[in-house]
């Protein structure tokens, strides 16, 4: 998900998405360990999405207005 899309979300929505992505990341890692993962690049995408959302949450916490 793009940062511009995430910036339009509320803080509660972002926290919810981070939770969903963490759960998905757990499942992807489990699939990787058992050899069932079809698209290993998805792990990277999910990790980056979590990082983007956490960055936006931190910016809001500090009162930084980027973008």
UniProtKB/Swiss-Prot annotation:
Any one annotated GO CC term: cytosolic large ribosomal subunit
Gene Ontology molecular function: structural constituent of ribosome
PANTHER family referenced in this protein's UniProt entry, alphabetically: 60S RIBOSOMAL PROTEIN L35/50S RIBOSOMAL PROTEIN L29, LARGE RIBOSOMAL SUBUNIT PROTEIN UL29C
GO BP of this protein: translation
UniProt-recorded name of the protein: Large ribosomal subunit protein uL29
Keywords: Ribonucleoprotein, Ribosomal protein
Pfam families according to UniProt: Ribosomal_L29
Domain of life: Bacteria
